[in-house]
Amino acid sequence: SKPGEMEKLERIIRPTIGVITYIGHEHDENFDSLDQKREEKMKLFAHTDIVIEDATHQNVRTCAAVMRALGYDEEIITERILHQTHETVMEVNLTALVDNVRYFRNLLKPKTKLTCMVKAFAYGAGSVEVSKALQQSGLVDYLAVAVADEGVELRRAGITLPIIIMDPEVAAMDIILENNLEPNVYSHQSLKTVIAAAEAKGLENYPIHIKIDSGMHRLGFYQEDMPWLIARLKAHKAVRVQSVFSHLAGSDEAQFDAFTKEQIHYFDACAETLKKGLNTPILKHICNSAGIERFTKYQFDMCRLGIGMYGFSFNGAQLRNVCTLKTTILSVKTVKAGETIGYGRHT
């Protein structure tokens, strides 16, 4: 459960056969990284004759590579519990990801906050692993996911950063509140729902985030909704507005720069109306990854970083590659000129 324990245990029991079936996230707080945890576990098998590993589990498969790197005999590393194996894997370099976050962080003013998007399994990179790396980096103020279940998973994994739920479902509102997750409010009905849920639990000043529709036309309030919104929020003390935000539709393309600025100005007007009407400090944020690079002057109080974490720059910056897809070539064949391959016989 902490560094140094396996060597002591190995000297006591001197196992001759080792079996690895699972390595999870228990006791993660005692290790600097998952790699350090794997290395610690492998020290138990320093003098074993054979190690049997469950090749269906990614962490366990990685242990074999760790053992080779530590100088273990290739012959003792076997894969005996084979029910299902995958020869195509995606490797995620969390150090590179944090370096990319640091690049975007450095484009912002010291007091500007940063939200990182970890929705959809962190775009396939592993929401728990990515979130832990971000939390440990100290570079991030908020995380954001799409639905409540994603936020609950992060809470259970030990993530303590504030988490915004971008698409909160009505049926999940109790779960959101119970797990200290912060819902996006984007319509009259969504505000009524979160107020009712918070009041039912006897809560006061529960943080919510107000979405403004500045031109993307998916979710959000308009300028004409501000009087109703202000009146409703003043009448109910169960919730308080933590931030007001919007989404840019084309911040990554120069051809849409004029529209992007229109969005920003419309959003700013709505946000200022809301702040003055409620007479309270509220964080404002509209810039995404491209916006951070291309519209830095409009960083307001916070920015949201998503695809930029994975090495995508919209200014040509040399960011680090984070994800690598690896596979095994099944076959190499020589085909005569003019012959076709696969269905359709198209050339």
Model-derived regions, located:
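A short acidic, helix-capping loop that chelates divalent metal ions and anchors anionic groups
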Residues: 25-31, 85-87, 251-255
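A conserved, hydrophobic alpha-helical segment in the catalytic core
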Residues: 13-25, 55-82
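Residue-level signal for inorganic ion chemistry
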Residues: 9, 21, 37, 59, ...
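Positively charged, low-complexity intrinsically disordered leader regions
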Residues: 82-109
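Flexible active-site lid/hinge loop adjacent to a nucleotide/diphosphate
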Residues: 1-54
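Anionic-ligand-binding alpha/beta catalytic cores of soluble enzymes and soluble regulatory domains
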Residues: 257-347
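Active-site-proximal beta-alpha core segment in soluble small-molecule metabolic enzymes
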Residues: 89-91, 112-283, 299
